[in-house]
UniProtKB/Swiss-Prot annotation:
Natural source organism: Mycobacterium tuberculosis (strain ATCC 25618 / H37Rv)
Name the UniProt record assigns to this protein: Probable inactive lipase Rv1592c
Domain of life of the source: Bacteria
GO terms, molecular function: triacylglycerol lipase activity
Other remarks in the entry: Was identified as a high-confidence drug target.
A Gene Ontology BP annotation from the UniProt entry: lipid catabolic process
Coiled-coil blocks: none
Stated family: Belongs to the AB hydrolase superfamily. Lipase family.
UniProt xrefs under Pfam families: LIP
InterPro entries: AB_hydrolase_fold, Lipase_secreted
Length: 446
C-alpha cells in the first residue's frame, strides 16, 4: 500500500499516471474531509488534465452510517475545474455491481445527491461511509436510489459535486465536477470500466440542479464522454425565484444555506453582506457553513432574511450585485447535448413548476430532445421515489440505444396512475429492504 502523502512533495507533474492507492481498512471511522489527508491534492496536480485520478482508496459504505453494505466501493480524488476555470480537486465514490466479472463492462450512471449544505458531513464521500456521523444529511437516504441503479447492473459514480468547500448553488462548476468525476471513473484502473462505456446522469432537487449543469456543459466541456441521457428531477431552475419563494417559510434554511455558500463565489455578494447584514446575520451565515441540511432547516424555520439587514430585503435583492448572482445561477445558459427527462411536481411547495416549465421550453427551443413529465398529484419529496421506476426504464432505453419515438414535451398524467409505477415501487421496496438489512443486491432490472 502506498501512503497518500508519499508523492505530495513531488514537484511539477512527475507523479501523474501513478496515483497512490489505499487498500480497504475495515471498521475505521472516517475523518471529516476537512481533516482527511486523502482530500488534499499533491503538489503539481494543477498540471494534470481534468479527470485525472490523483489518488484512490477502497472504502466501506453503510446505510445511515450504521448498516454495512456488501458492495465494492472505490473513492477517487481527481483534478477538476471551478467556475472561474481554476484547477481544484474533489472526490467521487464509484460503486460497481457485485456480479460484474473482471473484463466485463456495464453502463455508468453518475448519480448526483442533494447535498444541499456546505458542511462536509453532507458530502457523499463522507456521508455514505460506514461509521460516518452525518445525522441531518439528506445524502444518506439517497443510498436507496443508488442501490436501485446497482440492481440494474450499472456502475455508479457519486461525486462531491459541490467541491471541497461545499459551494452549494454556484453555477457551472457542479457540472464540471460531475463530468470530471465520470472521466476519473473511466480512467481508473481500479474501477476497470471501458472508455466506451455509455453514461447516464440522474439527480433530484439539489442533485437535479447539478445534473442539469452537467447536461448543459457536456457538449463543450466533455465531448469525449458518451452521455446518452440525463434525468433532471425538480432541478431548481431559478435560484433567485426559489429564494423569494422560500424565505420566511418553514424551509427558509435552504435559501439561507445558498446565500452562505454563494458569498464565497461572488465577491459582490460578500461585499453586500458585509455592508448591510447586522452582527446576528453575519454570525448566522458563519454558523450555517457547519450545519447539515436538516439542522439548518430546523434552525431557520420561519425566519426572514430581511430581519438581518439594515435595509428592506427587496431593495437589497434589486442591487446590481445580487441581480448578477441570481442571473448567473439560473439554469438555461446552454442547451443539453444528450436527451433529457425532466421530472417536476405541479404542486411542489419547494420548486415553482413555472420555473421548470420555462427551463423545459428553453431547452426545447434550443433544439434539445426533452421529455417533460409534469406530475399533477405528487409533491416534492414523494415524486423522487415515485418517478424512480420511470427514470430507470428511461435510462435503460438510452443505454440500449433505443430511439426516443415518444417525444413528449409535457404531460400532466400522474405517475401514481401508471400501473408500471406499482410494479417498480414493489421492486424498489425489495431493494430498500435489502439495503436496510445489509443484504447483498442481485442484478434484477425493472
Amino acid at each position: 500500500m502506498v501512503e497518500p502523502g508519499n508523492l505530495a512533495g513531488a514537484t511539477g507533474a512527475e507523479w501523474i499516471g501513478r496515483p497512490p492507492h489505499e487498500e480497504l481498512q475495515r471498521k475505521v471511522r472516517p475523518l471529516l474531509p476537512s481533516d482527511d489527508p486523502f482530500y488534499f491534492p499533491p503538489a503539481g496536480y494543477q498540471h494534470a488534465v481534468p479527470g485525472t485520478v490523483l489518488r484512490s482508496r477502497d472504502v466501506e459504505l453503510a446505510f445511515m452510517g450504521l448498516i454495512p453494505q456488501p458492495v465494492t466501493a472505490t473513492q477517487l480524488l481527481y483534478r477538476t475545474t471551478n467556475m472561474y476555470g481554476n484547477p481544484e480537486a474533489t472526490v467521487t465514490t464509484v460503486i460497481v455491481p457485485a456480479e460484474l466479472a473482471p473484463g466485463q463492462t456495464c453502463p455508468l450512471l453518475s448519480y448526483q445527491c442533494a447535498i444541499d449544505a456546505m458542511s462536509s458531513r453532507c458530502f457523499p464521500s463522507y456521508a455514505l461511509r460506514r461509521r460516518a456521523k452525518a445525522l441531518g444529511s439528506l445524502t444518506q437516504m439517497e443510498l436507496l436510489m443508488i442501490s436501485a441503479a446497482l440492481a440494474e447492473g450499472w456502475a455508479v459514480s457519486v461525486p462531491d459535486h459541490e467541491g471541497p468547500k461545499g459551494l452549494w448553488g454556484s453555477p457551472y462548476e457542479p457540472g464540471y465536477r460531475v463530468l470530471d468525476g465520470i472521466r476519473a471513473a473511466l480512467n481508473s484502473e481500479r474501477v476497470g470500466l471501458s472508455p466506451a462505456t455509455p453514461i447516464g446522469l440522474w439527480g433530484y432537487s439539489g442533485g437535479g440542479l447539478a445534473s442539469a449543469w452537467a447536461a448543459e456543459a457536456c457538449g463543450e466541456y466533455a465531448p469525449d464522454l458518451d452521455i446518452v441521457g440525463a434525468v433532471l428531477g425538480s432541478p431548481v431552475g431559478d435560484l433567485g425565484h426559489t429564494f423569494r419563494r422560500l424565505n420566511g417559510t418553514l424551509l427558509a434554511g435552504l435559501p439561507a444555506l445558498v446565500v452562505a455558500a454563494l458569498q464565497h463565489s461572488y465577491p459582490g455578494l460578500a461585499r453586500v453582506i458585509k455592508e448591510h447584514a447586522n452582527d446576528e446575520g453575519r454570525q448566522l451565515l458563519e454558523q450555517l457553513t457547519e450545519m447539515t441540511t436538516v439542522d439548518a432547516v430546523i434552525r431557520m424555520a420561519g425566519r426572514d432574511m430581511g430581519d438581518f439587514l439594515d435595509e428592506p430585503l427587496e431593495d437589497i435583492l434589486s442591487t446590481p450585485e445580487i441581480s448578477h448572482v441570481f442571473g448567473d445561477t439560473k439554469l438555461g445558459s446552454a442547451v443539453p447535448t444528450p436527451p433529457v427527462l425532466i421530472v417536476q411536481a405541479v404542486h411542489d411547495y419547494l420548486i415553482d413548476v413555472s420555473d421548470i416549465d420555462a427551463l423545459a421550453d428553453s431547452y426545447t427551443a434550443g433544439g434539445a430532445n426533452v421529455t417533460y413529465h409534469r406530475d399533477l398529484f405528487s409533491e416534492h419529496v414523494s415524486l423522487h421515489p415515485l418517478s424512480a421506476p420511470m427514470t430507470l426504464r428511461w435510462l435503460t432505453d438510452r443505454f440500449a440505444g433505443k430511439p426516443l419515438t415518444d417525444h413528449r414535451v409535457r404531460t400532466t398524467w400522474p405517475t401514481i396512475f401508471n400501473p408500471m409505477t406499482y410494479a417498480g415501487m414493489a421492486r424498489l421496496a425489495v431493494i430498500a429492504a435489502k439495503v436496510i438489512t445489509g443484504r447483498k443486491l442481485s442484478r434484477r432490472p425493472l
